[in-house]
Amino acid sequence: MRSHGQHISDRLTVEVDCHSLSSSECPSMTSGFSPLDSPTPTPTSLYSQGSMASPGWHDHPHYHHGVPMERRTSATPLRSAFRMADLTSSETMMGMPCGTMDRQEQMPLPDYLPGYDENVDQLWIPQDMPKTYHEHQFPYQASMPQYNQMARNYYHRPQQAGYLPESASNPCLSRPIFTQPTERMPNSASMSNMLHWMPSHESLVPQTITPAQVQPFPSGPVTPPSSSYSDFPTNIPTFKSHTPSTPHRSVSMGTPSGSDTPVSRMSGHNDYQEDFQLSPVYREGMMQRHRQPSRKSSKKQLLRSNLSLENLPSIIKQVQFKCKEPGCKGRFKRQEHLKRHMKSHSKEKPHVCWVPGCHRAFSRSDNLNAHYTKTHSKRGGRNRYVATLDETSQDFDPDFRGQLTPDGRPIYGSKLEDTMPDCGELSVDGWDD
């Protein structure tokens, strides 16, 4: 036991009102109790720096008779291992009632002693306890800022600056749709024009809404009264009955007559075009989208119009050469293109196919060459196959002009003017000889 000359800050003073106990059962200031004799480590921030020894509880045999204390051992430093147990009687501690104290009026010890942890058992102290230093009570550090008188587990949100209620931004939370006057606010009115009649944030107090004030949405078609809404649109779609996931609220924010209601938003697409002015380009695009039936049909019509020679740009019309054939509207940019086109109108076809049995004539040489490639160079067609015109054949010779065998092979040494022998009398071998 240390001497009683220690500094007053090295001792933990516990005052207990012992009017119903004898002097032998009540521990007091003269019992020599000191927290420095406790075997359980306690936070050093609770005591002064006068001693580096671990404080401990006084192991007195009848200390637990007056106010029952529960002692626990723990190896974790800076943790509280004691608590006040069974504070259910009407006895007073330090002159304050503890047993009749409500749970919300109790404040955990970590709010007074920063060395304690919230996870350990807490020593509850009344919240009304003055947070000033007294020499004969718990010494502690500087006082902490006062909290609001509310439950400790209440989530306190600081009051914001001026704000608008939810019903101001959500039209579905305004008054019922058929209780407003008939006239509407002009569409040009903005939120800045409505701020002068809106109440300030000091006058916006929370309101409790009773279930009787809640008016649910109608389950059937909405039929407005003829006396209230004479200009109500007649093409409003029927509302579908539904069950909302959240309860409906009807909040009154003191909107004056002429305020915009959800009914004024029901007239459809035209009202939104009035409220939000569309750009000319966007409006024209929307009109074209409604006029055009489909993209495919519009593309076909565009291609047909482009194929017409009358729809050519004027810059090309100035330099083109027009066909002089009656009834022909052909125009060309170059002279040689016009000459080639004029041959299609002439009856002269100097280019004739040389293949025996064909004798097809063309007015242009390129058309004749295309005829050779597409008609006589392929097997299995109804036209005669010519091996000299097939690039894949070993007899390929585009300059050959002469007689051909029945299978299309050339007869070298023959001429086109020669008569072909009868196929029944001569064989292919005889032709080769």
From Swiss-Prot:
It is found in: Nucleus. InterPro entries: Znf_C2H2_sf, Znf_C2H2_type. A zinc finger (C2H2-type) spans 321-345, 351-376. Residues 23-65, 238-270, 391-416 are annotated as: Disordered. Residues 23-33, 238-264 have a biased composition (Polar residues). Pfam families: zf-C2H2. GO terms for cellular component: chromatin; nucleus; transcription regulator complex. Keywords: Activator, Conidiation, DNA-binding, Metal-binding, Nucleus, Repeat, Sporulation, Transcription, Transcription regulation, Zinc, Zinc-finger. Its main location: nucleus. Residues 34-48 have a biased composition (Low complexity). BrlA, abaA and wetA are pivotal regulators of conidiophore development and conidium maturation. They act individually and together to regulate their own expression and that of numerous other sporulation-specific genes. Binds promoters of target genes at brlA response elements (BREs) containing the conserved sequence 5'-(C/A)(A/G)AGGG(G/A)-3'. This is C2H2 type master regulator of conidiophore development brlA. It comes from Penicillium roqueforti (strain FM164).
